[in-house]
Amino acid sequence: MKYNFDEIINRANTNSKKWNPDIYKATYNGHNDLLPLWVADMDFRVAQPILDSMSKIIEHGVLGYTGVDEEYYQAIINWNKKRKNSHIEKEWVVFTNGVVPAISFMVQTFTQKGDNILIQTPVYHPFRMTTENNERNIVTNPLINNEGVYTIDFEDFERKIVDNNVKIFILCNPHNPVGRVWTKEELIKMGDICLKHNVLIISDEIHSDLIFKEHKHCSFLTLDKKYFSNLIVCTAPSKTFNLAGVQTSLIIIPNENLRKAYQKTLGNVRIETPNSFGIAAIKSGYTEGEEWLDQVIEYLDNNRNFIEEFLKENLPEAKYVKPEGTYLAWIYLGDVLKDREIEKFFEEEAKVAIDYGHWFGEEGRGYIRLNFACPKSILEEALNRILNSLK
């Protein structure tokens, strides 16, 4: 089946956090007339097999309590083996209703108030928020920024762990917002340091199905089993198949002791199984959604390249390195905007809703994160709004 990702679907009159003006205006100083390219979901219609599986539930007419069966687990296991070359066991899979709440429960389970947690800035800001909201402390290992290409400062990484008695390291792979897909060698270096100092690795791999053709994602689950003693991997069909509203995520915990401790925390708040639509989405997405996903990645690749071409031709002062994974463009506009206030420029002049770089840490100041998982016509309009507002 050929999918049409140029189709514009009106999401403004839904409860879309991204598109509903009455919702997003709280984030953008009351402005409700912006073109949204911020929240990390796609503006594409979901794969037809997933929609069909959900329609069957509605047609059946009963929405009772749910449980999961063998088909559910096999869909997850087979997908991970085929797409990611990772072997997981049925028993390792733990359900939560989202990666961010899942990480919050991990912080509560495996640390005490006042403990230190390491992140690599600029990074997805809920990592900081959920840590600090749980009364733990953030320690940063800033990524090295070489003209928009980011690498890891391993000496600083280990020094920060030792000096601060770090308990948890939250890794983002692929990295949001900078778009790096960490290599096997980079993961091994971080893994060995964490193993040496008994640091729990939480690897957020929610974007791991969205990798561009010249790169390959390497999960911690594909590495030496020695890392499994202190490893939790967070995945979900939400980014892969545009299902954030279904609120279903999959937490992979190979170590039995870690898994039991975590399940106890979840059991205390009665987080047990996905909802009816989450189960259907996982089964149908992971067994019949591959064709849709491959077409999405191809479309995203074209959008990724279009941004590069547009900026080179019209805004050469902007700094943009194409992401290796994710559908998020990380663009430096400090030399373009100069002394202009970035919020005022986007909200009052360009009228485009993006994520401001400083939301991801001070290292992101002057940057924007732009979501290009949208029809090309919308992306082109947003870029032209930015360009025309600079004239």
Residue ranges and their predicted role:
Residues 2-98, 105, 285:
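N-terminal small-domain helix-loop-helix segment of the aminotransferase-like
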Residues 52-53, 225-301, 309-310:
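Conserved core segment of the aminotransferase class I/II
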Residues 55, 158-161, 191, 195, ...:
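A structural alpha-helix within SAM-dependent methyltransferase catalytic domains
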Residues 63-192, 209-210, 217-225, 232:
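Conserved core of the PLP fold type I
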Residues 283, 299-308, 320-333:
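Conserved glycine-rich beta-strand-loop-beta hairpin in the small C-terminal domain of fold type I
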Residues 336, 345-354, 360-391:
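PLP-dependent enzyme catalytic core of the Aspartate aminotransferase-like
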